[in-house]
Amino acid sequence: MRGGTLAACAAALVAVAGCAGGPRGAQLASHDFGDSPAFDPAVLAIAVREVEVSAPSWLDSAALQYRLAYDSPTRRYGYRDSRWAAPPGELVAQLLRKAVIAPAPGAGGCRLRVALEEFEQRFDAPQASRAVLALHAELVAPRGGARIAARRFELERAAASADARGGAQALAQAAAALAG
């Protein structure tokens, strides 16, 4: 009888646990930059053979981040049901590689080093947001590692909607503008 009671109790717990979960939540949305514009690396004045992108620890996750500049300007948030397909640094690196690395014979070419500084959707009001993409880029000589040029970029694009989808699209547009 004792074994039967345990089995009945276990079955009841499983049934209750199944009901306790309630309806399934929203499905997790995974964003990337979509179809890249066509790039022609051959038009570049300097051949690039390698792209290195680094990012600070807070951008080293797939979280789609936003900031409520009008309310909590020092606080970062992440959308619960939306993520990037990869950390922003990886997405930016992939896009830049398509844009600047030309298939060329030989091992020549400079290195492009990029330090991603900011990659977020920023809300200036509850229904108004924009994408903010900031980075420092450095072109390094193929031999010896001497810096040829360096520049800081900050791009902003208005989001079409004040939600994760609008932020992801605006950030993708900012990244495409950087690469183009």
Residue ranges with predicted function:
Residues 1-19:
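Sec-dependent bacterial lipoprotein signal peptides
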Residues 19-85:
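A structural "domain/chain start" motif
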Residues 20-38, 98-146, 161:
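Surface-exposed short loop/turn segments
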Residues 43-50, 63, 91, 107-114, ...:
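Extracytoplasmic
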Residues 53, 115-120, 154-156:
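Generic short beta-strand segments
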Residues 73-82, 144-180:
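Short secondary-structure boundary motifs at beta->alpha junctions and helix caps
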